[in-house]
A protein has these predicted regions:
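A detector for small-residue-rich transmembrane helices and their helix-helix packing motifs
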Residues: 2-227
Length: 227
């Protein structure tokens, strides 16, 4: 039987260091979220109803800016801190590896769409606040892109890493009546869909960033890995 050779992806887009200014952009965004939340707490009676996403304001009055301002408003310190941890992680990764058009442009646009779809499913008296929809969109996008892009890691190991991270950061330890898990699910689903579309539109440039090396020839064709 003849010798067979194959190739292995040694590096991908995600093997490189995040782009410059990733830390600064992350710190700036987190500062904005924390600052607006603090203002809302100090002036809750006047400011909180103005910034929250409500059916009356968004669906009836056309105040679509509420879909974005609601992201920066949180109910209490624990609410904002729990979101801030994941926002720091995913903001750094999305801006660092995919740039300005993924974060903040696509991220905030899809977070607004997440809030809009969520409002459509709730009674008119429900209002939405918090960055959880954004966090879950970012998680869905990043985890999906990792599966699609990081071919320097074997498929099984990639899936295992994604499942473990998803269970660790996305699965709630307790269930609370005032938390919109529906918004979480919508954000996560939109994140996955956004990643699939983004990957297809940018597949050529993403694959061009790969560094491929040839493996030593061997005899068993069943061990050949697909390109």
């Amino acid at each position: 039987m003849g010798d067979f050779s194959t190739h292995r992806v040694r590096e991908t887009l995600l093997s490189r260091k995040p782009r410059e200014w990733s830390l600064e952009i992350t710190a700036l965004f987190l500062s904005m979220i924390m600052g607006i939340s603090l203002l809302a707490w100090r002036n809750g009676a006047a400011l909180l109803p103005t910034l929250a996403a409500t059916s009356e304001g968004v669906l009836k009055q056309g105040e679509y800016w509420r879909l974005l301002t609601a992201i920066a408003v949180h109910g209490d310190v624990m609410h904002v801190l729990s979101n801030a941890i994941l926002l720091t992680f995913f903001t750094y990764l999305l801006f660092g590896y995919f740039g300005f058009w993924v974060f903040p442009v696509m991220s905030l646009a899809m977070a607004g769409l997440t809030n809009y779809i969520s409002l459509l499913t709730y009674p008119s008296e429900v209002s939405l606040i918090g960055a959880s929809g954004l966090v879950y969109w970012m998680a869905g996008f990043w985890l999906s892109m990792y599966l699609l892009v990081e071919r320097s890691v074997g498929p099984r190991k990639r899936v295992l890493r994604v499942v473990c991270l998803a269970l660790l950061v996305l699965l709630p330890s307790t269930f609370q009546a005032n938390v919109s898990y529906r918004t979480h699910a919508i954000g996560l689903g939109l994140g996955v869909v956004s990643a699939l579309v983004y990957f297809q539109r940018n597949r050529e440039s993403i694959r061009a960033a790969e560094v491929v090396e040839l493996e030593e020839p061997f005899d068993d064709p069943d061990e050949i890995l697909p390109p």
